[in-house]
Amino acid sequence: MIHDAFEDFAAALPQMTALVGLDFGEKTIGVAVSDRIGAVATPLETIRRKKFTLDSNRLLEIIAGRDINGILLGLPRNMDGSEGPRCQSTRAFARNLSRVTDLPIGFWDERLSTVAAERALLEADTSRKRRAEVIDHVAASYILQGALDRMRHIRSS
């Protein structure tokens, strides 16, 4: 089930649970996973997009192998908060994904996540080639960590 409001997504999840975070792009899908208590996000891999069936099969393999209970997609809003074509593509991917899994699917505002990931990789003195290889799943971990922190705040209030 797709939850447009982040609070609804958080409420649909068990208290302590592992999530997968996705940075959905035109050519790749960055994948990050959280630990089982939903505290720390870790970059996992970048899927080179081919067809939805192949992409979703790889995601479902990751989910099955890690006891994941929710899917979080970064929503690439414009800087003014409006939604453009990339948001529409992300929402379409979420709709298609909801047809192959019963897990709750939520969205997190991903504005500037790739910029933050790029900056962190530069500070770590990562080579240009290596940055290109890991940027998407590092960005996915930034997206997922932001959502995990927000969930912790919601649940402590």
Curated annotation (Swiss-Prot):
Record carries keyword Transmembrane helix: no
Main localization of the protein described in the UniProt heading: cytoplasm
Enzyme Commission no: 3.1.-.-
Enzyme class: hydrolase
Cell location: Cytoplasm
Name of the protein in question: Putative pre-16S rRNA nuclease
PANTHER family: POLYNUCLEOTIDYL TRANSFERASE, RIBONUCLEASE H-LIKE SUPERFAMILY PROTEIN
Record-level Gene Ontology MF annotations: nuclease activity
GO biological process: rRNA 5'-end processing
Role played: Could be a nuclease involved in processing of the 5'-end of pre-16S rRNA.
GO cellular component: cytosol
One Pfam family recorded for the sequence: RuvX
Organism: Ruegeria sp. (strain TM1040)
CDD domains xref list: YqgF (cd16964)
Record key words, sorted: Cytoplasm, Hydrolase, Nuclease, Ribosome biogenesis
Family label: Belongs to the YqgF nuclease family.
